[in-house]
Regions:
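Short, structured beta-strand-loop surface elements
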Residues: 722
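Glycoside hydrolase catalytic-domain context in secreted enzymes
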Residues: 1-696, 700-718, 727
C-alpha cells in the first residue's frame, strides 16, 4: 500500500499537503511510524498484513505543475538532515517500513529514482534499508521524456535499476525494455537478479507463496468493512482532528435556537473525503450532522454560493424535452460501447448528479464498472442569451450540439468543464452527451444547461430574516487541490494554489452576512492552511475541520453543539496572507513554517477548547548518567474551567548558540484529559534525539553540547510558552 506520505508540508500552496501529517519533522515521523506499524502488523508476526510505503523520497513538496521537470538544487545540508530526511530515516530504522517510493523530481541534477546517492548511499548503506524501492508512477519514463537525463527508455531502465529502484510503477513502462538494455550492455542479468529477489521476498512476507490458511491476515472477513466499530473510529478521528481557532462565546450553540446553514461545503459529499481516499458506503455531510443534532425545523439551509464561482446557474432543463417529456433522457448499457439492448432509460428534470462512489449506481440495473450512457435532449430557449452547458465527470465523454462536437476527453480525476452557447429564442438545439467508464476508475457525472447569473447577496440575506446565527460552511475541496490536477481557476494551478486566501466569492458572502449583523460561525474545510485574516475579524467563531471523512458531519455537529469538547491542535501554520510566503519553488526553509517564521495568524500547535487549563510548577531535571533520557520535564496541569477537556502539552527546544538554526523545534508532546478542577502531574522525557541537531562544524547530525532553551506550553506561540534554560554537557 503506497502510504504514508511523510513529505514535509513546507508551503500551504502545495495541493498534496493534505496527504501529509503537517510541517513538523518530529510530528510527521511519529504519525508515519504509527501508520506503518498499523498497516504492516507486528514485526513478531510470521507474515506482514501488507507492505507500507514511505513516500515520496525525498525533498518533495510541490509545485505539482513542475514536478516532472524540477531540479531541487538549493537545499542546504541543515535543511536536508533536520527537515526533509528525519521522517524517512525513522520509518526505515524504527518502523521497519517495507517499501520506499522515490519521487519524480531531480535532486542535485539526478532524478530521485536514478540517484545512487539517495537510494544506495543514504537509504541502504547509511540507514540499512534492505527492502524494495518503487518509483512514483511514470518517474522512470521522466528520465528520457522530461528530465532528459537518459536518451532512451533502455538507458532509463538500466539507470533506474542500477541506482536501486526495484519496481517501476506506471506510465511509459521503461522496465519492459530491460531485455533490450541487457542486449545493449547497459546492465547485466546478475544486476537485475538482486532486485527480483527483493520483490520475491516481499511476496514471501505477505504469505503469497504459502497456503492461504497459513496467513493469519487472510482470515480477516470483508464483513468488517464499515462495521459499527470502524465507523465509531472514523467519528472519533474526525472529532479529535477538529481545531477551534476562534470563539467569542458563541459556541457551543443551543440545539433549540434557529440557525441558518449556508455555504458550498455544507452538503458536499466528495469534499468530506479528501484525496487518495477510500470510498465510504455512506457519508454524513455537515448539513446532515447539524440537522440530526438540532432538528430540521430549527435549521434553514441555503447553498448561497459555489466554492469559487461568483455566479449561480439558473437551470434551463424545464425548457428541454426528450420523447415529449421535460428534461434530459439518459439511456444506459452494461458495456462501454453502447451496444445491444439498453439496461434502462431515465428522465431528469433537475441537474444531473450521479456517481458510483459510496456503492451508488448511475441508474437502476446499471453496474458500477464497464458501463456507458447517452444523455440526450432538445433545448428550445425561451429567450436569446448566453447559455452554458456545465458538466463534471470522471471517465470518457463526447459532447455534441446539433451534431457538432464541442469536446471529447477522458480523465481519472473529477474534472469540471464549461461550454458557452449563444442561443436564440425559439431555435432548436439538440444536445448529445455520450459517456463511458474507463478502466477501473470511479465514475461521476454532473450535467446542467442554464444561464449564469450574478449572486444576489441581499436576496439571500432577506431569506434569513429572524435568524441571528449563521453557520457558514466554506473553504475549498480536493476537487481544487490535489495531485497534478487540470484545474485552471483563479487562485489554483495544476492541483496547487497560487494564493492561499479564501476564494473571493466566499469572502464576499461572509462580508455581506457580517454587515447584515449576523453572528457567524465559519466552518472551514480544507486540506491546507487558508489565510483567514478578514474572516477572523468578521466571524464570531472559526472552526477548522479539514476534510473530515465519512462520519465528519456528525463530528462537526458534536463540536458545534457542545457534545464534544474540541481538542485539536494545528499541525501547520496559518499565515495572514500570501504575501508572507517565500517563492513556492524555493526549497530553503528560511521564512517557512513555525520553525523559521514568527508572525502567523494562527500558530502551529494552536487550538482552543470549551474549557481552560493552567500549567504550573514547571521544572526540568537532568537525568543521571546511563539513563535513557537526558532530561525530564515536570509540571502540574489543571483544568480551570467547567467542562471536561483535553490539553496537549508541547515541548520545543532551541540551541542558543546557533544563529542560523530554527526559532524552536517540537521535540515532545503529551495529551492529557482532565475533569473540571482536576490536576494531573505531567512528566515528559527528553532523550538524545531531542538534542540531535545539524552541526555545521562537522557537517553531521549529532548531539551538540551547549546552552539550550526549552519551551513548554499549549502551542508554538511565544505567549503560550514558558521558557527554561539548560546546559547540555
Amino acid at each position: 500500500m503506497w502510504t504514508p506520505n511523510v513529505n514535509i508540508f513546507r508551503d500551504p500552496r502545495w495541493g498534496r499537503g493534505q496527504e501529509t501529517y503537517g510541517e513538523d519533522p518530529h510530528l510527521t515521523s511519529l504519525m508515519g511510524q504509527a501508520v506503518v506499524r498499523g498497516l504492516q502488523g507486528p514485526e513478531s508476526a510470521k507474515y506482514r498484513k501488507l507492505l507500507a510505503c514511505a513516500k515520496h523520497y525525498a525533498i518533495h513538496s510541490g509545485p505539482e505543475w513542475s514536478r516532472h521537470v524540477a531540479n531541487i538544487n538549493n537545499v542546504s545540508p541543515r535543511d536536508l538532515w533536520e527537515t526533509y530526511m528525519p521522517a524517512f530515516k525513522d520509518l526505515v530504522q524504527k518502523a521497519k517500513v517495507r517499501e520506499v517510493m522515490c519521487a519524480y523530481q531531480r535532486w542535485d541534477d539526478e532524478p530521485c529514482c536514478g540517484s545512487t546517492k539517495l537510494l544506495q548511499q543514504i537509504l541502504r548503506d547509511e540507514w540499512g534499508f534492505k527492502y524494495m524501492v518503487v518509483s512514483d508512477c511514470g518517474a522512470i519514463a521522466d528520465f528520457f521524456t522530461t528530465h532528459k537525463s537518459s536518451s532512451t527508455p533502455q538507458h532509463a531502465a538500466a539507470k533506474g535499476v542500477i541506482a536501486g529502484t526495484d519496481v517501476e510503477c506506471g506510465f511509459g513502462y521503461a522496465y519492459a525494455k530491460l531485455p533490450e538494455a541487457v542486449a545493449k550492455g547497459l546492465i547485466t542479468e546478475e544486476e537485475i537478479d538482486k532486485h527480483v529477489v527483493r520483490l520475491l521476498e516481499g511476496r514471501f512476507e505477505l504469505g503469497e507463496m504459502d497456503a492461504h490458511e497459513e496467513c493469519e491476515w487472510s482470515k480477516i472477513s470483508p464483513s468488517i468493512l464499515s462495521c459499527k466499530e470502524h465507523r465509531q473510529l472514523s467519528l472519533e478521528m474526525a472529532r479529535q482532528s477538529i481545531v477551534l481557532l476562534k470563539n467569542e462565546e458563541l459556541l457551543p450553540l443551543s440545539k433549540k435556537q434557529k440557525i441558518a446553514v449556508i455555504g458550498p461545503n455544507a452538503d458536499n459529499i466528495p469534499m468530506m473525503w479528501g484525496n487518495y481516499n477510500g470510498t465510504p458506503n455512506s457519508t454524513v455531510t455537515i448539513l446532515d450532522g447539524i440537522r440530526a443534532k438540532a432538528g430540521k425545523k430549527n435549521v434553514t439551509y441555503l447553498k448561497g454560493c459555489d466554492l469559487t464561482e461568483e455566479c449561480v446557474v439558473n437551470s434551463f432543463l424545464t425548457q428541454c424535452k426528450a420523447d415529449g417529456k421535460k428534461g434530459i433522457r439518459g439511456t444506459f448499457w452494461n458495456n462501454t460501447t453502447r451496444s445491444g439492448k439498453p439496461v434502462t432509460t431515465e428522465y431528469y428534470v433537475n441537474p444531473i448528479a450521479v456517481t458510483t462512489s459510496g456503492q451508488h449506481t448511475f441508474a437502476n440495473g446499471v453496474r458500477m464498472e464497464d458501463f456507458s450512457a447517452m444523455y440526450e435532449t432538445t433545448f428550445v430557449p425561451e429567450k436569446s442569451c448566453k447559455a452554458v452547458i456545465r458538466m463534471q465527470y470522471t471517465g470518457a465523454f463526447s459532447l455534441k450540439v446539433n451534431g457538432k462536437t464541442l469536446a471529447a476527453d477522458s480523465t481519472w480525476r473529477d474534472q469540471p468543464m464549461r461550454f458557452e452557447l449563444d442561443v436564440e429564442k425559439g431555435k432548436t438545439y439538440d444536445v448529445e452527451l455520450a459517456y463511458h467508464t474507463v478502466k477501473t476508475w470511479g465514475a461521476n457525472m454532473k450535467l446542467n444547461i442554464g444561464e449564469e447569473l450574478p449572486i444576489d447577496y441581499n436576496e439571500t440575506i432577506e431569506k434569513l430574516k429572524g435568524i441571528e446565527t449563521v453557520v457558514f460552511v466554506g473553504g475549498i475541496s480536493s476537487q481544487l487541490e490535489g495531485e497534478e490536477m487540470p484545474v485552471k481557476i483563479d487562485g489554483f494551478k495544476g492541483g496547487d494554489r497560487t494564493h492561499i486566501e479564501l476564494p473571493k466569492v466566499q469572502r464576499e458572502f461572509i462580508r455581506h452576512l457580517a454587515e447584515a449583523g449576523k453572528k457567524i460561525v465559519f466552518v472551514n474545510c480544507s486540506g491546507s492552511a487558508i489565510a483567514l485574516a478578514p474572516e477572523a475579524e468578521r466571524c464570531a467563531a472559526i472552526v477548522q475541520v479539514w476534510y473530515p471523512g465519512m462520519e465528519g458531519g456528525t463530528a462537526v455537529a458534536d463540536v458545534l453543539f457542545g457534545d464534544y469538547n474540541p481538542q485539536g491542535k494545528l499541525p501547520v501554520t496559518f499565515y495572514k496572507s500570501s504575501s508572507q510566503l517565500p517563492d513556492f519553488e524555493d526549497y530553503s526553509m528560511k521564512g517557512r513554517t513555525y520553525r523559521y517564521f514568527s508572525d502567523p495568524l494562527y500558530a502551529f500547535g494552536y487550538g482552543l477548547s470549551y474549557t481552560t487549563f493552567k500549567n504550573e510548577n514547571i521544572k526540568i531535571e537532568k537525568q543521571p548518567a546511563g539513563d535513557s533520557s537526558l532530561f525530564t520535564l515536570h509540571s502540574s496541569l489543571k483544568n480551570t474551567g467547567k467542562r471536561e477537556g483535553t490539553e496537549v502539552v508541547q515541548v520545543y527546544v532551541r540551541r542558543c548558540d546557533d544563529a542560523d538554526g530554527p526559532l524552536k523545534t517540537l521535540k515532545a508532546f503529551e495529551r492529557v484529559t482532565l475533569k473540571p478542577g482536576e490536576t494531573k502531574k505531567v512528566e515528559i522525557k527528553l532523550d538524545e534525539e531531542a538534542f540531535t541537531l545539524f552541526d555545521p562544524d562537522t557537517n553531521t547530525m549529532r548531539v551538540v553540547p551547549g546552552k539550550y532553551e526549552v519551551f513548554v506550553g499549549s502551542s508554538s506561540r511565544p505567549e503560550d510558552l514558558k521558557k527554561l534554560n539548560i546546559i547540555l554537557n
